[in-house]
């Protein structure tokens, strides 16, 4: 009987312990830190959203977007994803035809073929053309310095001199340049139990 009682208790303990186990990715408790008040859904004063990504702007119904902007009192949206060439021209045509005073569009650089003869001059010329077509700035994505490689397979750094023509042209055009760079150090370390960003890297591998 004594041994049976021990076996039963051991079984109950093991069962209770198993119910306490949970995958780290599953653990997401609601916060108990609750403050009085209600969510602010509309800004008191008109504001400018300086960081937005609207990839479908060439063909999207801007009226729907404007409705959402008006609900929160957003006066102007800066779309950092204007791309380049014909795509940017179509975005600007859509904006000018419908809401010319509500959007600012930034161009982007196509970093394919870095290292080819004359690549920098061509990229700078395309940027100038994009500005003529309505772009108000240049947005550089985190891929530069992270995944962009030249024609020889070598990673292209942000301070690569082959990009100097682009920065020079941006200065001549007097347009702002926004660069997303310097990812956290753990992004470059082994993805194991010692990486403090493991959960982020596991659940969002494309970051």
Q: How would you name each of these model-derived features?
A:
Residues 12-16:
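Sec/Tat signal peptide C-region and signal peptidase I cleavage site
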Residues 3-11:
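Bacterial N-terminal signal peptides
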Residues 8, 40-42, 171:
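Residue-level detector of alpha-helix boundary/anchor positions
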Residues 6, 79-82, 105-110:
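A generic structural motif
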Residues 17-101:
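An N-terminally biased module of ancient metal coordination in phosphate/nucleic-acid-related enzymes
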